[in-house]
Amino acid sequence: MACTAKPACTAKPGRSPRSQPTRVQSLPKQVRKGGVDVLAAVPLSEETEFKVELFVKPVIGNAEGTTPHYWSISSPLKTAEAANVTPDADTTVCYSLSQVAPPDIPNQVSECDMLIWELYRMETEVLVLPVLNAGILTTGGVGGIAGPQLYFWAVGGQPLDVLGLAPTEKYKGPAQYTVNPKTNGTVPHVYSSSETPRARVTNEKYSIESWVADPSRNDNCRYFGRMVGGAATPPVVSFSNNSTIPLLDENGIGILCLQGRLYITCADLLGVNKNRVHTGLSRFFRLHFRQRRVRNPYTINLLYKQVFNKPADDISGQLQVTEVTMTEETGPLPPTVEGNVGVPTTSNLSHLPATVTLQATGPILNTQG
């Protein structure tokens, strides 16, 4: 029987043809952050969520020591600072630094992935007081604070990366306490991506007048800053406890604590009352962590070499030791044999395996006389 082709399917009058479902090709998506491949988040529970609260105090430099002053009011500004372009450290506000170590995660590492803590949201607020009587006592004048303001905070899995800048070509920063950027002394701003001074805030000696957060780095970090300028700007400071800050990026990933630490950096400048700099009394943080799976960047071979195959102690022993390989339980013979040992010496040397390596030069001899 001959095979006949089936007639084409035609739509009935008054009905539209059945639409075929659109096929969407799903491509594998690999998300990397902080140098690791990020996987799914662990569902929230009492064991997989962690919350911590802390207060971070303001920092003002110290002109006579190496420890910071946790003041909210600086020393009086000097009128000669404009000519000397070297301000006093007691009048310089520096970045405050703190760190949080979440608890250890049981069964954290497997062959394929590992569990880490992830900061996904937080609440923060600055503590302020109306400066009225304090202004009378410190300056002899009446009135609240005025002038420039700065509000800044940063949270990250590593210390904050900063750029070293100079407001003028002659500004060098305080001569004591603070860490000042090394510039060429001619250009006040960023002059090249490779020569601009860069650093990480690893202590509380970085002035807010010389260091600014680096937007080209800080991949595993979130920071926010707000500046209100003006010599006589009336400050407006609002504070509340009804704001939550999400810290997730476009892929839904927060701050990864890859080193088991979370670094917190902040600075709050309220203004100037006559000749004294006023800062916030403190900044409050409430941090919310959850667990996240990331691909294990360490192979079993690497762990074996770095952990198990590492000598426990370093010794200082004899040199010129030659490794000898034995084949078929036939041991090596000395290169020269004195006297007759059953058979001629040449016969014994001819039976040496090819894999035996003898100590040719500088043999180690134990002579007792």
UniProtKB/Swiss-Prot annotation:
Q: Does the keyword Disulfide bond apply?
A: yes
In terms of Pfam families, this protein maps to: Polyoma_coat (PF00718)
| Keyword Disulfide bond annotated | yes
> What biological process terms from GO does the record include?
endocytosis involved in viral entry into host cell; virion attachment to host cell
Q: Show the GO cellular component annotation of the record.
A: host cell nucleus; T=7 icosahedral viral capsid
Keywords attached to this entry: Capsid protein, Disulfide bond, Host nucleus, Host-virus interaction, Late protein, T=7 icosahedral capsid protein, Viral attachment to host cell, Viral penetration into host cytoplasm, Virion, Virus endocytosis by host, Virus entry into host cell
Here the segments flagged for biased composition (Polar residues) are 17-28
Q: Tell me the compartments it is located in.
A: Virion; Host nucleus
**Role summary:** Forms an icosahedral capsid with a T=7 symmetry and a 40 nm diameter. The capsid is composed of 72 pentamers linked to each other by disulfide bonds and associated with VP2 or VP3 proteins. Interacts with sialic acids on the cell surface to provide virion attachment to target cell. Once attached, the virion is internalized by endocytosis and traffics to the endoplasmic reticulum. Inside the endoplasmic reticulum, the protein folding machinery isomerizes VP1 interpentamer disulfide bonds, thereby triggering initial uncoating.
Describe, as the record does, how this protein assembles with itself and its partners. Answer: Homomultimer. The virus capsid is composed of 72 icosahedral units, each one composed of five disulfide-linked copies of VP1. Interacts with minor capsid proteins VP2 and VP3.
Q: Which family does it belong to?
A: Belongs to the polyomaviruses coat protein VP1 family.
Q: What is this protein called?
A: Major capsid protein VP1
Q: What is the lineage of its organism?
A: Viruses, Monodnaviria, Shotokuvirae, Cossaviricota, Papovaviricetes
